[in-house]
Amino acid sequence: MNNIFHGTEDECANEDVLSFQKISLKSPFGKKKNIFRNVQTFFKSKSKHSNVDDDLINKENLAFDKSPLLTNHRSKEIDGPSPNIKQLGHRDELDENENENDDIVLSMHFASQTLQSPTRNSSRRSLTNNRDNDLLSRIKYPGSPQRSSSFSRSRSLSRKPSMNSSSNSSRRVQRQDGKIPRSSRKSSQKFSNITQNTLNFTSASSSPLAPNSVGVKCFESCLAKTQIPYYYDDRNSNDFFPRISPETLKNILQNNMCESFYNSCRIIDCRFEYEYTGGHIINSVNIHSRDELEYEFIHKVLHSDTSNNNTLPTLLIIHCEFSSHRGPSLASHLRNCDRIINQDHYPKLFYPDILILDGGYKAVFDNFPELCYPRQYVGMNSQENLLNCEQEMDKFRRESKRFATKNNSFRKLASPSNPNFFYRDSHQSSTTMASSALSFRFEPPPKLSLNHRRVSSGSSLNSSESTGDENFFPILSKSSMSSNSNLSTSHMLLMDGLDTPSYFSFEDERGNHQQVSGDEEQDGDFTFVGSDREDLPRPARRSLFPSLETEDKK
């Protein structure tokens, strides 16, 4: 026994074979307690195998023998008989020294197989490892039916990915021929729609709004480079625009302080039309609504026929009567619209420098009336323009509640077919229509026309044929008054008040009527005469209830 385990090549072969068995099967042979528990596996009878299984085993054995990682003496020992129990007992004492070398050899063998198929996924690697473990177990235990079944099952599983790979290759061929599956067609359609929408959005957003596409240039602020003295209003926290004094305005207009830094200087008068007509700064423009402001300074710049070749920006000076509310509000709206248009060119703008005239037109008129034409001053709350002031302020308040944002002002500012292009024409037509509507002369409604039964010749009222009596009894009927289209409803209601007796003698307690001669009637006042109160007919009662009147007479 000692000659078998010492100093021969068979000893080394047996040790290597047992190490492969321990690593692949993960059997507890390393623990001495479990040695005799696994001895029964060596005495199991060999199961019957088919010829197909034997051929597969022989092929795998040949492939394993031809591996470059195995030595010649190992291949010889694998073909030998299985070791006995004593050899296993002695092998357990020598396993600890050779575990490291065997692990390295086995890992190199598995690595060589994985390198041959680098495109396999993790599931294929696990199947390959199980296949290698089953291969080693079948080499050691060729008669075990359980191991052969697991080996054949692993081979059947390992063949499925190859079938899938062949089907994938056939699909690739079909795609090259132009036959695309429906799923890929839908995905390609979605991708094309997304790309088309992005292209349309970029083209739509860049074509109307890009200043360079229409020849419009945007500029940066150069107010700090100029010699214009400006300051900010500390009393109003919402005022973000610099302010200038009336003296600075005079120097800009007369001494051309901004000629080297600005292409031109424009003064915007935000007062109402009647204020501007009463007196304004020379060469100023009257704009008192947001629509007019957008049309003059945004639409004309974007959609003008002539290209803008200016290399310098335009300086804007905005004011109202006191430059406290209307002027700063319109200046803020213009800056907001300018920022929306030039959002891709931040911080450049069409009008980077906007100044507020501190004190407004009143301060200029008080200090430098020679700058005004005509040299007059009409206030907003002037007595002769109270109605116009109230109407214009209502419009201005409604406009101030609207905020210009990117969503609600994007197409309004950029569209060339905006109705604000015709703002001035429509405004002028509306003013002419209003003036023509108010040009008629006011005439009061005609006076009441009363029909009388008997009226003297000196009376101005309509009279019927005289019967010779001096006394007369006027007949007041609503039917005669309703026939006249000039009478109003209030006059009709006035007739109801005539039903009550408006004439009686306060001297007589019974209410006898006064008797007046016909000569006294000619003085101009109506005097109703009757000997008895019942003799006077009541027109409303007679017209509404004629039957009651006849009963009363009876």
From Swiss-Prot:
Enzyme class, UniProt record, top EC level: hydrolase
Keywords: Cell cycle, Cell division, Hydrolase, Mitosis, Protein phosphatase
Gene Ontology CC terms: cytoplasm; nucleus
Protein's GO biological process: cell division; G2/M transition of mitotic cell cycle; positive regulation of G2/M transition of mitotic cell cycle; positive regulation of G2/MI transition of meiotic cell cycle; spindle elongation
Family note: Belongs to the MPI phosphatase family.
Function: Terminates the cell cycle delay. Reverses the CDC28 phosphorylation catalyzed by SWE1.
Keyword Cell cycle: yes
Reaction(s) catalysed by this chain's protein: O-phospho-L-tyrosyl-[protein] + H2O = L-tyrosyl-[protein] + phosphate
Protein name: M-phase inducer phosphatase
Catalytic residues (positions): 320
Disulfide bonds: none
